UniProtKB/Swiss-Prot annotation:
GO biological process, one term: L-tryptophan biosynthetic process
Gene name linked to the record: trpC
CDD domains: IGPS
Superkingdom of the organism of origin: Bacteria
Source species of the chain: Acinetobacter baumannii (strain SDF)
Gene3D superfamilies (UniProt xref): Aldolase class I
Official protein name in the record: Indole-3-glycerol phosphate synthase
Length: 268
């Protein structure tokens, strides 16, 4: 397990534990369960991703700790509409406030303006956050292996499936992949190409880890996909699912940036 102490990720996780305590005081788990039951029906995230080639999870992100403000003119509803028209399979919506200037309500805003399923992109540390994701109308959650113990991964993925949520498990290296593979095969696997300590990006990380997976297992490459050549390189290694945010968010028209990178995805 990567030691995340003294990294940005470590600071984020510490803040998330503080945030969890505050949220529990504001609304107990039982109340959140009731909100989750009343949420709009799930849209199948994994299913949508598997039926587009390439399958693109297009991210709605205003800022990041490393880049600061990425998109000053930030309208989640408009961005969601543009992504759907461009051919995205799914959305990824940042809800972290402190480091990414996201907001819980952005999931519902984005979903209300398109038919795409949405991932709650956040740093979840407890099953409470998972139930909360469903209450916020998310269709999928992100579990970052570097932030969580094996027990937490098991418990939180189980909670997600009990609430009809899909699960994207994110890894950075071989050791984390080995841990992720202990979880249900229902989980989607994502490889983040960004080194947590240096923040350098190496697309070969996905290619290297892909070789350790059964051919049938869908793999999503995350971070650093910026040019059509990057996309082609992944496709040549039988990687057809992508999570892309910054490359779209920093352009005036995210839909045009999407088309420049991926062309027109086909339904399969």
């Amino acid at each position: 397990m990567i030691n995340i102490q003294n990294t940005i990720l470590g600071k984020i996780v510490d803040r998330k534990h503080e945030d969890l305590a505050a949220r529990l005081k504001q609304r107990n788990l039982q109340d959140v369960e009731e909100l989750a039951k009343a949420a709009t029906p799930v849209r199948g995230f994994a299913n949508a991703l598997q039926h587009k080639r390439p399958g693109v999870i297009a991210e709605i992100k205003k800022a990041s700790p490393s880049k600061g403000i990425i998109r000053a003119d930030f309208n989640p509803a408009e961005i969601a509409q543009q992504y759907e028209q461009a051919g995205a399979a799914c959305l990824s919506v940042l809800t972290d406030v402190d480091f990414f200037q996201g907001a819980d309500e952005n999931i519902a805003i984005a979903r209300n303006h398109c038919t795409l399923p949405a991932l709650r992109k956040d740093f979840l540390v407890d099953p409470y956050n998972v139930v909360e994701a469903r209450a916020l109308h998310a269709d999928c959650i992100l579990l970052i292996v570097a932030c969580l113990s094996d027990q937490q991964l098991e418990e939180m993925s189980k909670t997600a499936f009990e609430h009809q949520l899909d699960v994207l498990v994110e890894v950075h290296d071989e050791e984390e992949l080995e841990r992720a593979l202990k979880l249900s095969e229902q989980c989607l696997l994502g490889v983040n190409n960004r080194n947590l300590k240096t923040f350098d990006v190496d697309l070969n990380t996905t290619i290297r880890l892909k070789k350790l997976l059964p051919a049938s297992r869908l793999l999503i490459t995350e971070s650093g996909i910026a040019t059509p050549d990057d996309v082609r390189m992944m496709q040549e290694h039988d990687i057809h699912s992508f999570l892309v945010g910054e490359s779209f968010m920093k352009q005036p028209r995210p839909d045009q940036a999407f088309t420049a990178l991926f062309g027109q995805p086909q339904t399969v």
